[in-house]
Amino acid sequence: GQQQRVALARMGAARPGIFMFDEPMSALDSYLKSALEQNMLDLFDVCNRTVLYVSHDIDEACRLCERICVMHNGHVEEIGSIEDVVRRPQTLAALRLTGCKNTSRARKIGEEEVEALDWGMTFNVGREVPDNVAYLGIRASYFHVDNRAERGRNSYDLHVARVSDSRFERLVLLDAPRVDAPTRLQWKVNKVGVPADGLPQAGETLRMHFDASKIHLVCR
């Protein structure tokens, strides 16, 4: 991180009209990245200049920037505040950039119903579905086990194909109903304070519920 700190000092001394950064922390470990982020925020506060910051890390961008521009294949897909881009993405590129692990081609099948073509699943989204809807997205932490006796709307019995653990989460891969689905659904489970036998296990079948308000619809 020393080279990056020296570069920051040189940039500040030059007093440019615009600061431009191209993934300056991509090669740093988490400790150095956190320290350098604080140095950069201090510099931004003191210099009061426009900053153009390029990153593939949405959390990094949210911490350092006020507005986000989503680029895909050299074109601007959308631009807006962090709230707009993260909470209300308008394109598939924005969905994926903001960390949405589960995306599928989609088509409208009812006033408030949409079919996830890649998964063989249908959802009632509780709002009008655009006629030209093209994709839907569901974030990996936005669905949960449905403990009701009867399967309700937006609930599916899904087989746990595989699990893998990080320090604080378990990633659960769920087989979609469509036999030849190109991808599995990813579900993130917080495992802090949860006994091992209370976590999802490979081979289980779980009834999962997908909250209508948490299903993103985009038209391109």
Describe each PLM feature range.
Residues 85-88, 97, 146, 218:
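Residues that scaffold the ATP/ADP-binding catalytic core of kinase and kinase-like folds
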Residues 112-220:
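Non-catalytic connector elements of ABC transporters
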Residues 1-93:
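ABC ATPase nucleotide-binding domains
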Residues 87-110, 137:
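C-terminal boundary and immediately downstream tail of ABC-type ATPase nucleotide-binding domains
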